[in-house]
Amino acid sequence: MTEQFVATFKRSEAPSSRGKYLSRVFGIFSEEIVRIWAADPRAPFEDLGRPTLRMDGEDGYSTLDFTLRSRESGQVYPAELKCEIEYQGYRYFVLTGTKQLDHHSKPAFAALLDAALKRPGLRAFVNKNEIAVDGAILIWGAATNEGREVVVDAKGFSAVLTIADMIADLQACQSAPFRMLINERRTWSNELCDALLGPG
């Protein structure tokens, strides 16, 4: 699925504006794809909601994208989606190594790294209820096997998931909620274009 997913956006014969446009459109609803995947009972994780992380003794806090709980073990992981597709010439599209993480300097990503390393004093909350966490999960656009392994080893993530694999799972099981989401977004896009073109 990785090659197919990449080719959806990155085509050598197409103008660069195509990739920019598709990347922005996809970014509008990419988080919804993760939620639909996690809501499917066949997925290895379920989503408990957006987690808030903060360190004891510090005033600031960070809210991340997901709280993934393993359906097998019950372990809980804050998770963040980083799906930068066309940005800087697709430099961060496919995860191949740790250097691609270095430009993420915002507090939320730092909190994710703290959770991955199980930093003492880190507290997590979902819907204002404190929860125990067992690490952290990174969700990328696509990744090589080596890229996953290197990042897990270097940063301590419990797993590196990709939205490309999630889409493949949803396609394989013909997920009705996923198909509804995509068809709805396609309808909205067509309605906009039709309106801009005007009558006949």
Residue ranges and their predicted role:
Residues 81-168:
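Catalytic cores of nucleic-acid endonucleases
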Residues 1-42, 46-53, 200:
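Interdomain/boundary linker segments immediately adjacent to catalytic/signaling cores
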Residues 155-199:
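Polybasic (Lys/Arg-rich)
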Residues 48-74:
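Active-site metal-binding core of divalent-cation-utilizing nuclease and nuclease-like domains
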Residues 38, 98-104, 176-180:
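Short, surface-exposed secondary-structure junctions/capping segments
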Residues 18, 22-25, 109-113, 122, ...:
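Generic structural signal of hydrophobic/aromatic residues within well-ordered alpha-helices
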Residues 38, 66-68, 72-86, 99:
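Conserved catalytic cores of phosphodiester-cleaving nucleases, focusing on short active-site segments
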